């Protein structure tokens, strides 16, 4: 711990003391002449304690303000990230809206092309064409079914559009005229322009309404187009019927003319035969001359009628061929229209899905915008709170500075009025306190050094413990090996004892045999010397055995005697542990 001398009583602006914090600085202070030095010292101590409390309070306040500021900065960063995310989503939605507007323009162009084709087909001449009734009725039925299907799809689209408009009306009433819905069936281009120039959520909602209007209008256009096609087909059928009737009339007239020509030919042949039979009479000849002249004129007239009828037949055949070509063209057009009609529902479904997805995105954007507005309101509230806190902080700083100034003035006045003896006592006390603080500082330094040494010792202890664990593991391994060696030594000692016993038995047997041999073959004197030598040798052997069995290895702690050094070491480690 670091110490501060009491002569330096303040931390800021080199002031000797700080504010009391018990009241505002503008209050009138009591006269210092009425107080004794002891009371003044007590007041000084109180002022110092209050100053210390104020310092702690200011530190806590500053820490709280710092924490609050950090939280606000983190929150603002989060808001920035969310705003960036919302901007990216809005850009994607705008791109999708632009793509949908391009698709709408393409569909408009296709509808214009179809209308031009229908007008061209209606302008073609269909005066002298005809079709069979069965095929015409089938085509009429097909066109009627297509018209009914398109009307049903139109009704579905109108229902969807009405639901969307109701939803938009409800959302528009809740958001205070942020949404504008145009119910008039104007042109789609005007709605798209309004979408492009409208800001914020109005643009997103008007796009959905414009698309729904365009869809409904495209369905109406398709219906009108098919009605126009049906009218043109009915007109062509009427023209074909009239052409058929004319052809039938011409065929009947041709048949009648042919019959008349055949009758006249028969008459001429009959008259020629009569002329050959009756050549005598002149009167008859004159009559016959008059008759062929009239017949020739009639034949010429009939030939002229036949040629005119042939010309009319040829014209009728050419008109029939043209009508058949027109029929083929109309059939091809009908097939193309059927293909387009079969492709229109899938396109309508895709467009409906796009409208639904666009609507969902619009609703998401609206919800995000509302959330952003709420967050902006929260940020504004928190900014206002932060400004209030800053104002209070500034006021507290001003009060603190004023208190410091008043304390400086008080300390100056007190320092002028306090006696020299009191000052000496205070200086002595200050010196003693400084010395005590210095001694405590020295003690603290020594304690720090001892703590550092103890930490080093702890580190060495951890190292020593690790070494001890290694040594213990090695020792246990050596102990197990020594136990095995001890067991082997015990077995060898047992074997040696058995061998020694056998050796003693052999030696005793050898002595006895020697004694017997000496008793048998040697003199008695020599026997006595030999016996003495043998007795002496046996005594030496016994002494050597006794010396060998003397216990040398004993434990210094418990005094237990052990046969060898290895077992003694194992026993000593067990006793010590």
Swiss-Prot record:
<dbReference type="InterPro" id="IPR034735">
    <property type="entry name" value="NEMO_ZF"/>
</dbReference>
<feature type="binding site">
    <location>
        <position position="558"/>
    </location>
    <ligand>
        <name>Zn(2+)</name>
    </ligand>
</feature>
<keyword id="KW-0945">Host-virus interaction</keyword>
<dbReference type="Pfam" id="PF11577">
    <property type="entry name" value="NEMO"/>
</dbReference>
<dbReference type="GO" id="GO:0030674">
    <property type="term" value="F:protein-macromolecule adaptor activity"/>
</dbReference>
<keyword id="KW-0036">Amyotrophic lateral sclerosis</keyword>
<dbReference type="GO" id="GO:0005829">
    <property type="term" value="C:cytosol"/>
</dbReference>
<feature type="modified residue" description="Phosphoserine">
    <location>
        <position position="526"/>
    </location>
</feature>
<dbReference type="GO" id="GO:0043124">
    <property type="term" value="P:negative regulation of canonical NF-kappaB signal transduction"/>
</dbReference>
<feature type="compositionally biased region" description="Basic and acidic residues">
    <location>
        <begin position="186"/>
        <end position="197"/>
    </location>
</feature>
<feature type="coiled-coil region">
    <location>
        <begin position="239"/>
        <end position="508"/>
    </location>
</feature>
<feature type="binding site">
    <location>
        <position position="575"/>
    </location>
    <ligand>
        <name>Zn(2+)</name>
    </ligand>
</feature>
<dbReference type="GO" id="GO:0008219">
    <property type="term" value="P:cell death"/>
</dbReference>
<feature type="compositionally biased region" description="Basic and acidic residues">
    <location>
        <begin position="281"/>
        <end position="292"/>
    </location>
</feature>
<feature type="coiled-coil region">
    <location>
        <begin position="38"/>
        <end position="170"/>
    </location>
</feature>
<keyword id="KW-0391">Immunity</keyword>
<keyword id="KW-0863">Zinc-finger</keyword>
<keyword id="KW-0333">Golgi apparatus</keyword>
<keyword id="KW-0523">Neurodegeneration</keyword>
<dbReference type="GO" id="GO:1904417">
    <property type="term" value="P:positive regulation of xenophagy"/>
</dbReference>
<protein>
    <recommendedName>
        <fullName>Optineurin</fullName>
    </recommendedName>
</protein>
<dbReference type="Pfam" id="PF18414">
    <property type="entry name" value="zf_C2H2_10"/>
</dbReference>
<comment type="function">
    <text>Plays an important role in the maintenance of the Golgi complex, in membrane trafficking, in exocytosis, through its interaction with myosin VI and Rab8. Links myosin VI to the Golgi complex and plays an important role in Golgi ribbon formation. Plays a role in the activation of innate immune response during viral infection. Mechanistically, recruits TBK1 at the Golgi apparatus, promoting its trans-phosphorylation after RLR or TLR3 stimulation. In turn, activated TBK1 phosphorylates its downstream partner IRF3 to produce IFN-beta/IFNB1. Plays a neuroprotective role in the eye and optic nerve.</text>
</comment>
<keyword id="KW-0955">Glaucoma</keyword>
<keyword id="KW-0479">Metal-binding</keyword>
<feature type="region of interest" description="Disordered">
    <location>
        <begin position="261"/>
        <end position="297"/>
    </location>
</feature>
<dbReference type="GO" id="GO:0031593">
    <property type="term" value="F:polyubiquitin modification-dependent protein binding"/>
</dbReference>
<keyword id="KW-0597">Phosphoprotein</keyword>
<dbReference type="GO" id="GO:0061734">
    <property type="term" value="P:type 2 mitophagy"/>
</dbReference>
<dbReference type="GO" id="GO:0043001">
    <property type="term" value="P:Golgi to plasma membrane protein transport"/>
</dbReference>
<keyword id="KW-0862">Zinc</keyword>
<dbReference type="GO" id="GO:0005654">
    <property type="term" value="C:nucleoplasm"/>
</dbReference>
<dbReference type="GO" id="GO:0070530">
    <property type="term" value="F:K63-linked polyubiquitin modification-dependent protein binding"/>
</dbReference>
<keyword id="KW-0225">Disease variant</keyword>
<dbReference type="GO" id="GO:0001920">
    <property type="term" value="P:negative regulation of receptor recycling"/>
</dbReference>
<dbReference type="GO" id="GO:0008270">
    <property type="term" value="F:zinc ion binding"/>
</dbReference>
<dbReference type="GO" id="GO:0005737">
    <property type="term" value="C:cytoplasm"/>
</dbReference>
<feature type="compositionally biased region" description="Basic and acidic residues">
    <location>
        <begin position="261"/>
        <end position="274"/>
    </location>
</feature>
<dbReference type="InterPro" id="IPR021063">
    <property type="entry name" value="NEMO_N"/>
</dbReference>
<dbReference type="GO" id="GO:0090161">
    <property type="term" value="P:Golgi ribbon formation"/>
</dbReference>
<dbReference type="GO" id="GO:0034067">
    <property type="term" value="P:protein localization to Golgi apparatus"/>
</dbReference>
<dbReference type="GO" id="GO:0048471">
    <property type="term" value="C:perinuclear region of cytoplasm"/>
</dbReference>
């Amino acid at each position: 711990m670091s110490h501060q001398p009491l002569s330096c009583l303040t931390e800021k602006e080199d002031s000797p003391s700080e504010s009391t914090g018990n009241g505002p600085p503008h209050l009138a202070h009591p006269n210092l002449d009425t107080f004794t030095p002891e009371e003044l010292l007590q007041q000084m101590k109180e002022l110092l304690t209050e100053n210390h409390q104020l310092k702690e309070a200011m530190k806590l306040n500053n820490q709280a303000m710092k924490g609050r500021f950090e939280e606000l900065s983190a929150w603002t960063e989060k808001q920035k990230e969310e705003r960036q995310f919302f901007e990216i989503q809005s850009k994607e939605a705008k791109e999708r809206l632009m793509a949908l507007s391009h698709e709408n323009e393409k569909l408009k162009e296709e509808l214009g092309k179809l209308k031009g084709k229908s007008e061209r087909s209606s302008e073609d001449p269909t005066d002298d064409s005809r079709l069979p009734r069965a095929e015409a009725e089938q085509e009429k039925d097909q066109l009627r079914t297509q018209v009914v299907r398109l009307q049903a799809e139109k009704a579905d689209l109108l229902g969807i559009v009405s639901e969307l408009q109701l939803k938009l009306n409800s959302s528009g009433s809740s958001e205070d005229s942020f949404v504008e819905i145009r119910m008039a069936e104007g042109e789609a281009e005007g709605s798209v322009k309004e979408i492009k120039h409208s800001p914020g959520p109005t643009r997103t909602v008007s796009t959905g309404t414009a698309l729904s209007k365009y869809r409904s209008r495209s369905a109406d256009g398709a219906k009108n187009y098919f009605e126009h096609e049906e009218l043109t087909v009915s007109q062509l059928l009427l023209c074909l019927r009239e052409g058929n009737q004319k052809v039938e009339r011409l065929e009947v007239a041709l048949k009648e003319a042919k019959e008349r020509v055949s009758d006249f030919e028969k008459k001429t042949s009959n008259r020629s035969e009569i002329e050959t039979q009756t050549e005598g009479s002149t009167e008859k000849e004159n009559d016959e001359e008059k008759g062929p002249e009239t017949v020739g004129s009639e034949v010429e007239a009939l030939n002229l009628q036949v040629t005119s009828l042939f010309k009319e037949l040829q014209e009728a055949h050419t008109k029939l061929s043209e009508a058949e070509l027109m029929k083929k063209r109309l059939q091809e057009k009908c097939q193309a229209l059927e293909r387009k009609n079969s492709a229109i529902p899938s396109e309508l479904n895709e467009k409906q899905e796009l409208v639904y997805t666009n609507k969902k995105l619009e609703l998401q954007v609206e919800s995000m915008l509302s959330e952003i507005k709420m967050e902006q309101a929260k940020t504004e509230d928190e900014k206002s709170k932060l400004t209030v806190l800053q104002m209070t902080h500034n006021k507290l700083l001003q009060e603190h500075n004023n208190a410091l100034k008043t304390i400086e003035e008080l300390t100056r006045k007190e320092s002028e009025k306090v006696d020299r003896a009191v000052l000496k006592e205070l200086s002595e006390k200050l010196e003693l306190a400084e010395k005590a603080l210095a001694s405590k500082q020295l003690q603290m330094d020594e304690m720090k050094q001892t703590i550092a040494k103890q930490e080093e010792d702890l580190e060495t202890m951890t190292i020593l413990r690790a070494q001890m664990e290694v040594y213990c593991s090695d020792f246990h391994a050596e102990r197990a090996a020594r136990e095995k060696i001890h067991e082997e030594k015990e077995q060898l000692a047992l074997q040696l004892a058995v061998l020694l016993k056998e050796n003693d038995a052999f030696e005793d047997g050898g002595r006895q045999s020697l004694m017997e041999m000496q008793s048998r073959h040697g003199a008695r004197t020599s026997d006595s010397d030999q016996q003495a030598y043998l007795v002496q040798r046996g005594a030496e052997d016994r002494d050597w055995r006794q010396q060998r069995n003397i216990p040398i290895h004993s434990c210094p702690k418990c005094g237990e005697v052990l046969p060898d050094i290895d077992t003694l070491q194992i026993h000593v480690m067990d006793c010590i542990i």
